[in-house]
Amino acid sequence: MNNVISYVIIFGIFAVMMTSSINMADAELSYSKQVEFVGAIEETMGHILAAKDNIVDGNSELASLHLSHPIAELYDNLHNGLKNNPQIDSQVELALFILKNTNPDISSENFDEEAIEILKILNEAKSVLIQNDVYTNPTFKLDVISDLLMMSEHEYILGINSGGGNIGIVEFQDSHAFVVRAEIMLNTIDSLDEDKKNNLSSQLQELKSLILNEEPLDVVQTQFNNVLEEKNTITDNNFNSNIVVMSSGG
């Protein structure tokens, strides 16, 4: 798709969303569905991150695969969350369609501009569905991190079972990108005790290293378990006293 045309369409979508979106978050989604919805947005950001890395490296075939994954793999989750908001749903679908059809030989600068506008659309959809006090709650963010790690492990298994080639490379890159997004999410939890945050961050860094080196599945899965065990040691006492922590599942 012509880059200029795609920019115009994306800017137009965002302008419509800003003037027509609902101001109150949709309260109909269960807690677990809200985690899945935000997880799908974070995974989309992971695919965009992986696509950008391949665009910079000139790997257009790999970039193209990453660009196609959000609408192929994640749109159903986003659609299920947005079914009561059909206008925003159609705008998200169109944005992901534009992403899929982006020329993988695009310059990194132009891709950054396109990605920024797509992320604005996704964040606006998120603000419609997820109340701010839920999204900013540290327990919710930790649950999104768990969701990202579950999907990262799934992608790694797909990479191991792929038999090699570009498909395998893309699955490993997806796995790594989802851990990066988990790390970014962790760094937004300012209320978490510094020692706990550092311990969990160290475990995530070790996991990224194992994924990049394409270590055997049992080694990587052990580290996934280590990360989740570290995350599960976090209690209400590990947050600043002025933070109200919600219980998972409600």
Regions inferred by a protein language model and the residue ranges of each:
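Secretory targeting signatures
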Residues: 1-27
